[in-house]
């Protein structure tokens, strides 16, 4: 498991067992973004567990490729909306983020009156 923290709008910190990962998004243009990923390991792992480091980074990159596909598909959808003069600002982009919307609705319902509705 991991603990994720997003420092809106462009930095994500992911804390996994034995590694801290920082992803920073840099807009390069209206249709291009660079994702700089940095990995931080405890000294003993960085020095003596090279196979672990390589396996962990390979697993991370496999997930990053999936995330990249989602981003590219969402970008293509935004371009299609623009081309037909439509504007859907979100915050969720269906169908790719429907799960996130359902999760937030479920979570808000569990919080009840502790969180103001807006």
Q: What is each model feature region?
A:
Residues 1-118:
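C-terminal catalytic domain of Rieske-type non-heme iron oxygenases
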